[in-house]
């Protein structure tokens, strides 16, 4: 076993452990051996509790032999662990060091390095028998807490070590650096001032991109369809990928042991009954030419704003499940959503349009796709989706449709409801469910259906629902460009050796024919084998690059000419950055006199003011940072998700009734609503506010729009909104202390709040930036998109 309570290795856990298979034990030994040899490891397995145990195993092996490989063998190993800080610290608190084994290791190290001055605290690692004898007053225990011997430190950029023994007596006897550093900051991998001997990154928790891996780094994944896995094949990593093929070959005698659910494990690493359908479109060549031109323009340093608009348009057209006309009707009802025609018009209105033949050709290709090939009126994917869904519903089957975005989900709901001649609300009566893929994972939703339907995939993330949803049959509708891209990603992984297989699977034929990625590859690659489509790795790379959209690119001095344009004022800050604000934009402003952050409208602020941005967005509420960091099962997260559900129901009915804020305001007033500001209706719908403050407002809105649950479950929604407002006030209190406390020290209550949200002050600091106003441009008004209000731009990012 790996560190069970009966294990007499150096470090073990003092609480009952999950049972590890023999194959996992052997694999773990090989992985740690590779780390000692300065190799990088990619480990993917659904058994998440292996990750912290590998940290212990690396420490154990380093103390027995690894120290001999270091330039300074007297130095103790330093291990960086990038993961959920609180969970890892809780695990380490249960770990113990076997005293008998420790003393043996001290003797071995002492013998290897030679003379050590007993009075020099740097050499405490070889004198633990003496130190512990005095600490425990001659009554040496069998086991000692891990951090007494191997100091543990946690932090984000600055690390604080745990106290070692009563009043840190043991810590004062040992002057070497901590052994285990626990953080959630991935940037520590590239920390120049500190060199770690081993690095463990929990990629199941840390979702950022990975690059420039130091030697002896282990990357842990629990999802076979993580997009970083094919990307990392470009680096020198050894793959240990545990899929269903591995788990099915575990010794039957081991499976009978307690605490093991083999079926649950297999579900996490297996895909079955998948049909990939090639959707032939008449505009495939235009898409291929578009991504080539876009790449050419970007390499030629063409307008960054215009190429970003073009990338958005390519992305939307490939993802669309319906005609662009109906999509635009839905998107135009939300103030922050781009429409297809709106983006196209931006390109046509560009000041750079006639300066570059490639750009002009690109505009013509977009027009051809919409009008010559009729994507404005119909969609080849939508036609096949509709036929399949209606047929399944006719047979009485339950259907789950997964979309990549809320926009496409809403558009497809409207499309299918019109085809079935019913309201969106009534679709659920036919066991027809619609989900956004990221919600299934982020909210830990459990879904069962007969038929799972998806209609776009330009990355592995789009396929992840296949591992989460319990289905009998899955259909995936894709264009040739999408099939080519996914096939190339799968091919990249299959070309690399999987070192985990030899520990689980002895039959070499079986190793190649039934693994997870091979199963998927065969279903995607069949179209190339049948010569229906051609595979092209260069085209796959271009598609991936071309559909990468930057979140905020400065438009410069040019006005936006769309019908949804808003008038805004340009603000220059002292560091050269800029932002746009409307007259009534609500912003956070630093009140230095009273040492607090206040909420003001833009027309109330002046040149001496300092504006607060959260993640480079003046409109973003700080509480969003808190709620993003907490587990889906937390009561605050549940309340937040309840508000999200309420908002989506409101959004859907607003769209279905082709409503606008003026009309809804009149209907609300007629129904007895006593509010006089119609802007709150939009704020509720867009998520700018956390819903109504009055219980009656929820009921009136439900009665006017015909949403029964707003009336029946009003107390549930009201309680959720009230709870989040209380939590938001707590976040604001912490914000004030964070900005105005020079020592940035919180009291016990505020520290407990941060701990519950799994945050540190350093993490909050990374999300916050304050900007001092240098100039408010008063001689000109700018016309911009509603979504551009309040965003922070670097001027040099304009072109």
Curated annotation (Swiss-Prot):
Task: Name the job this protein performs.
Answer: Component of antiviral defense system DISARM (defense island system associated with restriction-modification), composed of DrmE, DrmA, DrmB, DrmC and DrmMII. DISARM is probably a multi-gene restriction module, this subunit has an unknown function. Expression of DISARM in B.subtilis (strain BEST7003) confers resistance to phages Nf, phi29, phi105, phi3T, SPO1, SPR and SPP1. Protection is over 10(7)-fold against phi3T, 10(4)-10(5)-fold against Nf, phi29, phi105 and SPR, 100-fold against SPO1 and 10-fold against SPP1.
Subcellular localization(s) per the UniProt record: Cytoplasm
Q: According to the lineage, what is the superkingdom?
A: Bacteria
Q: Which GO terms describe its cellular component?
A: cytoplasm
Which stretch is the leader sequence?
none
Protein keywords: Antiviral defense, Cytoplasm, Restriction system
Disulfide bridges in this chain: none
Give the species: Bacillus paralicheniformis (strain ATCC 9945a / NCIMB 11709 / CD-2)
According to UniProt, the name of this protein is DISARM protein DrmE
Q: Name one GO biological process term.
A: defense response to virus
Q: What phenotype is described for loss of this gene? A: When this gene is missing the DISARM system does not confer Nf, phi3T or SPO1 resistance in B.subtilis.
